[in-house]
Design a protein with these regions (language model features):
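Extended, charge-rich alpha-helical interface modules
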Residues: 1-79
Length: 79
């Protein structure tokens, strides 16, 4: 799985016409969660390749964007 999959999941979610409720409820797929867990484990063990490190960093940026989007969606919902 490449970082492209991370981007594809978020792009598909946005393109489907997300609502504030949908943004709050969004979670990455199980496959993506497993891939990220693998990358984190590799990073902790010091055995991560440069390509995998870049993939992990890209995912972390996307995760930050989604955290911020969820916070904004909660504000829009009045929570």
């Amino acid at each position: 799985m490449s970082v492209t999959k991370s981007y594809e999941e978020i792009i598909d979610f946005i393109a489907a016409g997300s609502t504030p409720e949908g943004v709050v409820a969004f979670h990455p797929s199980e496959a993506l969660q497993q891939r990220v867990a693998e990358l984190v484990d590799q990073s902790k063990q010091g055995s991560i390749s440069a390509e995998d490190q870049a993939e992990l960093e890209d995912y972390l940026q996307l995760e930050h964007i989604m955290i911020m989007a969820k916070a904004r969606a909660r504000q829009n919902l009045g929570n």
